C-alpha cells in the first residue's frame, strides 16, 4: 500500500511542500525567515481575530474599546501586546528575509521575487491601517499625514484623498473602512504567500553559493523542519520577552492620548519599521518628489533582477559587492534613526545624504562594482 501522505489529494500538496520537498543541503539559517514569516502571519491573524471580537471601529468608542481590551478582557493586554509587537517581529523577519534575497541573488527567481515585493507592499499597507485603529494621537495624525500625500498626485489627487477619507477629513468613515481593510488584507497576504511558495517550488530554493544544487538535495523533513524549530523558538523567546517585559518599547507614548483633531503632536512619525521610508520622503522639499521617492524606495526592489550585472549569482565570493551591501545596511539604519528625529539642522542634511546614497548604491555603485569584479576574474 502506498503512503497516505503521497496519495491523498490534500496531503500530497502538504507532502510536496513541507515533507518530501528536495532542498539544497547547504542552506544556512538565513533561509529560516520564510517559515518565521508564516508563523508571524498566523500569530497576527489569531491575535487580530480575538481583538476584533472586542474592538469597535467608531471614533467615539475606538480608543476606549482598546482600553477595555487591556483592562477588562481576560488576557486582553497579552493579546493586544502580542499583536502590536508581533507586527514589529514581522517586519524584522521581513527585512532580514529581503536582505538575504539581495545578498545571495535570490531575486533572479523573477516571479517569486515580484510576488515577494507585492507581499511587502501588502504587509506595509496592513500595518499602516492597523496603526490607525487604536485612535490615539499618533494614529489620527499619522493617518492624516500619510493619506494626505496622495493629494500630490496631479489632477486627481485631492479627489482621491477625499474618496479615501470618505469625507473632508480623517473621521468615522475613514476608521471604519481602515478596520475593514485591515481585517481582510492578512487573508489576501496568506493567499499571496501561497503563490510565493508555489513559484519558489517551481525552481527550488537558492543556496549560499548561488550555484545550482540539483545534484545535492536532501528532504525538507526532518532536516529543515528541525532547523526551522530553532528559529521558531528564538522568535517566540524574543516576542514574549518584548511583550512581558517592555511592551511599549517600540510604540509611541503619544498614542496613549486619545485622538484630538485640534491638537497636533510636536513630532508626527510612523512606527519604527516605516522610519527609513519616512526619512526619504522628508528629505525632498517638493511634495510630489517626496512621494515618488517614498514609493521608489520600496519599488526599487523590483528592479534588482535587471540591475544584476555580476557573472556570479551570490555575493559569497564577491568581497567588494559585500562591502557595498553592508554600507547599504548601515545607510538604512541611519535613515531609520533620521526618520525618528525632528526636522532641524544636522538631521535634515544627514537624511538627504543618506537618501542619495541609498539610491546611488542600488542603481549605480553596486552594478558597476559587479562589472569590475567580473573583469578582475577575467570572465
Swiss-Prot record:
Subcellular location: Mitochondrion inner membrane
Membrane topology qualifier: Multi-pass membrane protein
Keyword annotations of the record: Electron transport, Heme, Iron, Membrane, Metal-binding, Mitochondrion, Mitochondrion inner membrane, Respiratory chain, Transmembrane, Transmembrane helix, Transport, Ubiquinone
GO cellular component terms, A-Z: mitochondrial inner membrane; respiratory chain complex III
Binding locations of heme b b566: 97, 196
Main subcellular location: mitochondrion
GO biological process terms held by the UniProt record: mitochondrial electron transport, ubiquinol to cytochrome c
Pfam families: Cytochrom_B_C, Cytochrome_B
Molecular-function GO terms, alphabetical: metal ion binding; ubiquinol-cytochrome-c reductase activity
Binding site for a ubiquinone: 201
The keyword Mitochondrion appears for this protein: yes
Note: Heme 1 (or BL or b562) is low-potential and absorbs at about 562 nm, and heme 2 (or BH or b566) is high-potential and absorbs at about 566 nm.
Subunit details: The cytochrome bc1 complex contains 11 subunits: 3 respiratory subunits (MT-CYB, CYC1 and UQCRFS1), 2 core proteins (UQCRC1 and UQCRC2) and 6 low-molecular weight proteins (UQCRH/QCR6, UQCRB/QCR7, UQCRQ/QCR8, UQCR10/QCR9, UQCR11/QCR10 and a cleavage product of UQCRFS1). This cytochrome bc1 complex then forms a dimer.
Task of the protein: Component of the ubiquinol-cytochrome c reductase complex (complex III or cytochrome b-c1 complex) that is part of the mitochondrial respiratory chain. The b-c1 complex mediates electron transfer from ubiquinol to cytochrome c. Contributes to the generation of a proton gradient across the mitochondrial membrane that is then used for ATP synthesis.
Name the record gives this protein: Cytochrome b
The organism's taxonomic lineage, starting at the top: Eukaryota, Metazoa, Chordata, Craniata, Vertebrata
Amino acid at each position: 500500500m502506498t503512503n497516505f501522505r503521497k496519495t491523498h489529494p490534500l496531503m500530497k500538496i502538504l507532502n510536496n511542500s513541507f515533507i518530501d520537498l528536495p532542498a539544497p543541503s547547504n542552506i544556512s539559517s538565513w533561509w529560516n525567515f520564510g517559515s518565521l514569516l508564516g508563523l508571524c502571519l498566523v500569530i497576527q491573524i489569531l491575535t487580530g481575530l480575538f481583538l476584533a471580537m472586542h474592538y469597535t471601529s467608531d471614533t467615539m468608542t475606538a480608543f476606549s474599546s482598546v482600553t477595555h481590551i487591556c483592562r477588562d478582557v481576560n488576557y486582553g493586554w497579552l493579546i493586544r501586546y502580542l499583536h502590536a509587537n508581533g507586527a514589529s517581529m514581522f517586519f524584522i523577519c521581513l527585512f532580514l528575509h529581503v536582505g538575504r534575497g539581495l545578498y545571495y541573488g535570490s531575486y533572479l527567481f523573477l516571479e517569486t521575487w515580484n510576488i515577494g515585493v507585492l507581499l511587502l507592499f501588502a504587509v506595509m499597507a496592513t500595518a499602516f491601517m492597523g496603526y490607525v485603529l487604536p485612535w490615539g494621537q499618533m494614529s489620527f495624525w499619522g493617518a492624516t499625514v500619510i493619506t494626505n500625500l496622495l493629494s500630490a498626485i496631479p489632477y486627481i489627487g485631492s479627489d482621491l484623498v477625499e474618496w479615501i477619507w470618505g469625507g473632508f477629513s480623517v473621521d468615522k468613515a475613514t476608521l471604519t473602512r481602515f478596520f475593514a481593510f485591515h481585517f481582510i488584507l492578512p487573508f489576501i497576504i496568506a493567499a499571496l504567500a501561497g503563490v510565493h511558495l508555489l513559484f519558489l517550488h517551481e525552481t527550488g530554493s537558492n543556496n549560499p553559493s548561488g550555484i545550482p544544487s540539483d545534484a545535492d538535495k536532501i528532504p525538507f523533513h526532518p532536516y529543515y523542519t528541525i532547523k526551522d524549530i530553532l528559529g521558531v523558538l528564538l522568535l517566540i523567546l524574543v516576542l514574549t520577552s518584548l511583550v512581558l517585559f517592555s511592551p511599549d518599547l517600540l510604540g509611541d507614548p503619544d498614542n496613549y492620548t486619545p485622538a484630538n483633531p485640534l491638537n497636533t503632536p510636536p513630532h508626527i512619525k510612523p512606527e519604527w519599521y516605516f522610519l527609513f521610508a519616512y526619512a526619504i520622503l522628508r528629505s525632498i522639499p517638493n511634495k510630489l518628489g517626496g512621494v515618488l521617492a517614498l514609493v521608489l524606495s520600496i519599488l526599487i526592489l523590483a528592479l534588482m533582477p535587471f540591475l544584476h550585472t555580476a557573472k556570479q549569482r551570490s555575493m559569497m565570493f564577491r568581497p567588494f559587492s559585500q562591502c557595498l551591501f553592508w554600507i547599504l545596511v548601515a545607510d538604512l539604519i541611519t535613515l531609520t534613526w533620521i526618520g525618528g528625529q525632528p526636522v532641524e539642522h544636522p538631521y535634515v542634511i544627514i537624511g538627504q545624504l543618506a537618501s542619495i546614497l541609498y539610491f546611488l548604491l542600488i542603481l549605480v555603485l553596486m552594478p558597476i562594482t559587479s562589472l569590475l569584479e567580473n573583469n578582475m576574474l577575467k570572465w
